[in-house]
């Protein structure tokens, strides 16, 4: 799945940031240090994207993108390592693939509920309840995936020799950025 979506995902995020090849090499170098600590050896690939939005993402199979907007907000290499460690866990654990699979299953459940309740006077209520249930289930799994990525990402960060405090300063940066919205 990751390989199939990788090119399209990069293009949708503004394309590769080709102005500074040294920056791309630096990000890949830090990423590869952390990937070496990962529990799953994948052909990790790190790319800097020409997008001003502070964000990073991972696809199954080890494809990881970091927006240049996020790089501008980071204060240290350790914070970059914290971001990349987190994304490595998402890629290694297949969180993206699991979310897509869950989404397809939940869509099927909603469709089945819609068809089954079609002739009932309570069809709107049944479909609404199924939709809310699906949303709550998806949020729980998303929260668990984030906690897993935070936990193992911290382990990889420390194993690679970075200061674990960077995870805290990175979270403070994310809080500051979210307050600006």
Could you describe each region identified by the protein language model?
Residues 1-181:
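A Zn2+-metalloprotease active-site environment signal
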């Amino acid at each position: 799945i990751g390989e199939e979506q990788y090119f399209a995902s990069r293009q949708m995020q503004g394309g590769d940031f080709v102005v500074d090849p040294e920056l791309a090499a630096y990000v890949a170098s830090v990423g590869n240090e952390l990937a070496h600590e990962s529990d799953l050896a994948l052909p990790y690939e790190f790319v800097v994207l020409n997008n001003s939005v502070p964000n990073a993402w991972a696809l199954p199979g080890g494809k990881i993108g970091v927006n240049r907007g996020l790089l501008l907000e980071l204060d240290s290499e350790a914070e970059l390592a914290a971001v990349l460690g987190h994304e490595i866990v998402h890629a290694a654990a297949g969180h993206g693939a699991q979310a897509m699979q869950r989404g397809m299953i939940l869509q099927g459940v909603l469709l089945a509920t819609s068809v089954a309740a079609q002739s009932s006077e309570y069809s709107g209520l049944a479909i609404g309840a199924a939709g809310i249930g699906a949303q709550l289930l998806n949020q729980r799994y998303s929260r668990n995936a984030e906690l897993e990525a935070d936990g193992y990402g911290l382990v990889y960060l420390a194993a690679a020799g970075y200061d674990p405090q960077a995870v805290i300063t990175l979270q403070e940066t994310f809080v500051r950025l979210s307050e600006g919205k």
